[in-house]
Curated annotation (Swiss-Prot):
The chain crosses the membrane at residues 11-31, 51-71, 126-146, 147-167, 231-253. This is Uncharacterized ABC transporter ATP-binding protein/permease L733. It comes from Acanthamoeba polyphaga mimivirus (APMV). ATP binds at residues 349-356. It is found in: Membrane. Pfam families: ABC_tran (PF00005). One of its GO terms (cellular component) is membrane. GO terms for molecular function: ATP binding; ATP hydrolysis activity. Gene3D superfamilies: P-loop containing nucleotide triphosphate hydrolases. It is a multi-pass membrane protein. Residues 315-531 form the ABC transporter domain. Keywords: ATP-binding, Membrane, Nucleotide-binding, Transmembrane, Transmembrane helix, Transport.
Length: 532
């Protein structure tokens, strides 16, 4: 059974189960029984005794309605909340257990979010089916027992339905999702690039292709839907013919109105129960499939617990070798490097020389078991590599993705508490005050900022974090890339000033040539993976 389904079952409350059973018995057995009794009395002209079963019928329907309004729906919504948060917790724990470099890859994978959504809605749909349609199962059991006791001959006919129902449940939709996905991906590519085609006078051509793609999608969908409907209706027709044949036998053997009504209702119940099992099984299959996808995207990896160093004065790197898993490229230290608090260090090298990977190692993103090292922190050899300093560093990546549809105040503060003084200081040092002041920071939406302004807001967030966290190491990967030269120089000078005054070891790479000319304590050259 799926781990997520087991997780879901653990959230089932006793109250929901009890009310489902009571409601199922009332809806599926008592109410139909009362209805049949009233029908028999009407046929027999026994109007005198109609009041009692009729009052009981109304009472049962009242009980069923009250249960749904005040109990079942409440329990079900609570269960849905627990399931949704439980699935989120399950996936978050799997993500948290991964090494950070794998986490980065996983979180950039669109399939993760897609699989998670399918899992959530498949599970919720499965619970809806089992709770709201459970009365069909109770009815099926009750009516089967009645027929077994009162009409065992006709039950043999219903046995013929078993292979039909099993076949219906096991039936796999002939639609291949990859066909739909391929067509839809073609449409998305055309749609996302249509502006460039329009401004280069290819608008009619691209729109014709988009319309043609949609037409192909709809033709494929229509063909598959018709084929599936033919199958479903054929199964329903087979069930209907068998139940009607059974009714004919009932009329020939025992022409009794009550028996006839029960057999007639049982035919409908068989259809409903078959659809119940079919829908539940398919949702379960969807759940299993997407859990396999999740498990492939999020493998279970036991990460070792690395003891953290709270403070240090120096880091001596005697050996460092990191081999890329998918290429022959290798990062290797040429000669020992010694780093100290308050130092400002520039990594210099062309694109592709390994600067970002070296920063990933220093930031602890790449786990220590993936590279060879000999590192001393304050003359003490560490077995955890740079991961021992994870809690003492701030890392600003080059291609970090951000949610820009957020107010500047919330973007800058992040998970830190708000401080007006620190906010003012951060906006000033990041040169943001020409487009957002301290008074406007709560009402300025970042999505409306230009590319350069977004770059400065990101630097304001970094400065805010530095002041709040007071790290020992600051790692900056080309944070000046989106800035004009004069702004880049001014902002980096401010960052250097903060680092020197707070004894922060700053390791950075720069995009702007003027920034590279600033006063650095050490420049580490990097060339084709060779450090130093």
């Amino acid at each position: 059974m799926s781990d997520l389904l087991i997780l879901t079952m653990n959230y089932l409350s006793h109250g929901l189960v009890i009310h489902m059973i009571i409601n199922g018995i009332v809806l599926a057995l008592i109410i139909p029984s009362m209805t049949n009794k009233i029908t028999q009395m009407v046929v027999d002209n026994d109007h005198v005794r109609l009041i009692e079963p009729f009052v009981l019928l109304v009472l049962m329907e009242l009980i069923s309605g009250i249960q749904k309004i005040f109990f079942i729906q409440k329990y079900q919504l609570d269960l849905q909340r627990k399931i949704h948060t439980g699935i989120e917790d399950y996936i978050c724990k799997k993500i948290s257990a991964l090494p950070w470099n794998l986490t980065r890859t996983v979180l950039s994978n669109a399939d993760l979010g897609k699989s998670k959504n399918i899992i959530v809605y498949s599970t919720l749909s499965l619970i809806d089916i089992l709770t709201y349609q459970s009365s069909h199962l109770f009815a099926f059991i009750g009516y089967t027992l009645w027929i077994l006791y009162n009409s065992p001959i006709t039950l043999t006919i219903y046995i013929l339905l078993i292979p039909i129902i099993v076949f219906q449940i096991k039936y796999k939709n002939i639609t291949n999702p990859s066909v739909y996905n391929k067509i839809w991906e073609t449409y998305r590519n055309l749609a996302s690039n249509q502006f460039m085609d329009i401004i280069h006078s290819r608008g009619p051509e691209i729109h014709d292709k988009m319309i043609k793609t949609i037409n192909e999608y709809e033709e494929t969908r229509s063909t598959n839907t018709l084929n599936d409907n033919k199958y479903v209706e054929s199964i329903n027709l087979a069930i209907t013919l068998l139940t009607r044949f059974n009714l004919l036998i009932v009329l020939l053997i025992d022409p009794n109105i009550s028996s006839f009504m029960i057999q007639l209702q049982f035919g409908t119940i068989i259809k409903n129960t078959s659809n119940l099992f079919c829908s539940a099984y398919r949702k379960y299959q969807d759940l299993r499939k997407e859990q396999l996808n999740i498990d492939n995207v999020l493998p279970t990896i036991e990460s070792p617990i690395i003891k953290q160093i709270n403070d240090f004065e120096s880091i001596c790197i005697n050996k460092l070798v990191y081999e890329y898993s998918k290429t022959e490229f290798k990062l290797e230290l040429k000669s020992p490097i010694e780093l100290f608090r308050s130092q400002i260090v520039l990594l210099e090298g062309k694109s592709g020389s390994g600067k970002s990977s070296f920063m990933d190692i220093i930031a602890g993103v790449i786990p220590c078991n993936q590279y060879q090292f000999d590192i001393k922190i304050d003359d003490t050899v560490t077995n955890g590599g740079f991961q021992t300093l994870n809690k003492k560093r701030i890392y600003i990546e080059q291609f970090a993705t951000s949610n820009w549809n957020i107010m500047a105040k919330d973007f800058i503060t992040g998970h830190y508490r708000f401080s007006k003084i620190i906010m003012e200081h951060s906006l000033t040092m990041a040169n943001c005050k020409d487009f957002v002041t301290i008074e406007e920071v709560s009402s300025t939406n970042c999505s409306k900022l230009s590319g350069g302004q977004k770059g400065r807001i990101e630097i304001a967030r970094m400065i805010y974090a530095i002041i709040m966290d007071r790290p020992s190491i600051l790692i900056l990967d080309e944070i000046d890339k989106s800035l004009q030269t004069d702004l880049a120089v001014s902002i980096i000078e401010s960052v250097i000033k903060i680092c020197r005054s707070n004894r922060i070891l700053c390791i950075m790479s720069a995009h702007n040539n003027e920034v590279k000319k600033l006063n650095f304590d050490m420049i580490i050259p990097m060339n084709n993976g060779i450090i130093g």
